[in-house]
Structure formats: structure tokens, C-alpha cells
Amino acid sequence: MEHYRNLGRTSGVSAYEAGSDYIRVRFSTGSVYSYSYRKAGSGHVEQMKLLALRGSGLNSYINRFVKFLYD
């Protein structure tokens, strides 16, 4: 997994792994959740990948749009 930069210093996300049709997110609690095109939708997954690369906004996005859409 790639380290999440956490530019805002308040994120609950610590790392992520992006694949062609999914993103796996590790939270500071140690829990890992996978979000796929199938369950969360391609638009959400692609936006999450962009936020992960940016290092900002991923935790907020998850809480707002895809909190329970993990595999």
C-alpha cells in the first residue's frame, strides 16, 4: 500500500492501494476497506483515487458519499 500524505493532518486514512477497478483504504484504526466499481461505482472509485494521489480529502469523501459501499 502507498502511504497517504494526509496534507490536512486530520484524516483517518493512513494508506491506500489503487487497482484498475478498485481502491483499498487503510484507516488509522488498522481497518482496511475495499471500494470497487461494482459496489461503489466507477465515478466514486476514480474520484477516490484522485483524492488519494492528492493526499487530501479522501476521508471526508468516503464519509460523505461511499461510507457503506465497501465490498
Per-segment meaning from a language model:
Residues 1-71:
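A charge-rich, low-complexity, intrinsically flexible signal that marks solvent-exposed coils, linkers
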